[in-house]
């Protein structure tokens, strides 16, 4: 889009320059959904949660779920505050929208096996551990619900062929989904390209 005149161009340049001086970063587009979310715990809050970890049931995350935790922590998945509940999940799978109507193309889910959900209760908290067993986040468990993996594969990936890595991962995961907000205790360790990971 062409700016109408030199005055408008100078005003726009001045706005960007002042923003860079004040924040040391370029202004970006507004976050999806209009609100930037951060789920990373403040150090004091993190220490309180870490003291409770030995007394809270836990679930071990897959590599994909660990990546999702990072995106939830830094706001890359804004406006999501955690893993999808049933209404949002079903809406995303059927219509590529959250239940609110906001466009969202892929379900952000946390799967669990029947054995894992036996010790879990909605309204309670669950420690989410990385594949090495270290506490990564706390799930504030709001829902436990069943889902159809084959239906999700066909709807999201347009195939149920396990040669597709997304389908293979989906069909291998647990038969229950856990929904709820997360409090992220730390970002995942061993992340590649850390110098390029610029958070929103």
Q: Model segments located where?
A:
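Non-catalytic terminal extensions that flank enzyme cores
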Residues: 1-200
């Amino acid at each position: 889009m062409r700016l109408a005149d030199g005055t408008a161009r100078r005003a726009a340049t001045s706005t960007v320059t002042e923003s860079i001086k004040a924040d040391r970063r370029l202004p970006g587009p507004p976050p999806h959904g209009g609100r930037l979310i951060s789920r990373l715990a403040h150090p004091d809050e993190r220490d309180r949660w870490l003291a409770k970890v030995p007394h809270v049931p836990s679930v071990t995350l897959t590599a994909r779920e660990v990546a999702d935790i990072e995106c939830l922590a830094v706001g890359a998945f804004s406006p999501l505050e955690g893993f999808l509940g049933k209404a949002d999940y079903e809406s995303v799978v059927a219509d590529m929208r959250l239940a609110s109507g906001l466009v969202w193309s892929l379900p952000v889910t946390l799967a669990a096996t029947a054995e894992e959900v036996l010790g879990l209760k909605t309204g309670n908290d669950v420690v989410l551990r990385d594949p090495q067993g270290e506490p990564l986040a706390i799930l504030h468990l709001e829902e436990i619900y069943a889902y159809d993996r084959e239906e999700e594969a066909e709807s999201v990936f347009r195939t149920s062929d396990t040669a597709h890595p997304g389908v293979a991962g989906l069909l291998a995961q647990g038969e229950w989904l856990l929904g709820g907000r997360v409090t992220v205790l730390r970002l995942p360790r061993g992340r590649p390209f850390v110098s390029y990971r610029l958070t929103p």
